[in-house]
Amino acid sequence: MKKILCVLMAIAMLACMTACSGGAKSGVEDGVLTVGMECAYAPYNWTQMDDSNGAVAIVNDPGKFANGYDVMIAKKICEANGWKLEVIQSDWDSLVPGVQTGTFDAVIAGQSMTAERAEQVDFAGPYFYATIVCVTKEDSPYAAATSIADLAGGSCTAQIATIWYDQCLPQIEGANIQTAAETAPAMLMALETGMVDFICTDMPTAQGAIAAYPDMVI
């Protein structure tokens, strides 16, 4: 299963900006592209306390800076069009509504292209293809799983409003699906503290998890 990550925008194409339903602004009229992201979803985006390594100030969280793949992409878009970049931190499940209401011009946040989201906002196209995987503890009976069938009956969770939680976990027979985690770090903590047997996420997030938590395996 592949996860298609997209630039989610209130525009049809970056080169031809038009208004989107839901009251979004028409174009980058002031030369500033405002981009919404969670700023808590490494390696795509995260929060740090300085502007090292090209980090960009988070305009609605003074003193903090955003960095990651999504920030790099946003900077490239702005450089190509002569725009200034402003990053706005937003909760995951508020990103699509933020585009619809014009809170920001675009979302670049590792979100998957789905039919449901495509009915609400425009996509500028995929920028990354990520395999969806499960992460567990190295001493877990699920550590040797090689198929969905091997995960049957396990307790699990994923981040709220993601295809991992809404579409992937329900495919596991007899899965004891726990309440969705509000953030990616909360999802990882649920596994680390033993609240669940495994979590479902994408490969880049999983690779970051096992680097941070040596007792976790993909």
What are these regions (language model features)?
Residues 1-32:
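Short, low-complexity disordered leader/linker segments with a strong preference
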Residues 26-110:
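Extracytoplasmic small-molecule ligand-binding "clamshell" domains
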Residues 34-45, 123-146:
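Hydrophobic/proline-rich hinge and linker segments of small-molecule sensing/allosteric domains
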Residues 48-60, 74-83, 161-182, 211-214:
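Ligand-binding cleft/hinge of the Venus flytrap
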Residues 52-55, 137-155:
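Flexible hinge/capping segments at coil-to-helix
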Residues 56, 70, 118-133, 217-218:
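A structural signal for short loop-to-beta-strand junctions that line the ligand-binding cleft
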Residues 69-71, 86-98, 143, 178-193:
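Short helix-initiation/N-cap motifs at beta->coil->alpha
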Residues 93-94, 108-120, 166-171, 192-218:
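A ligand-binding cleft/hinge motif common to bilobed small-molecule-binding domains
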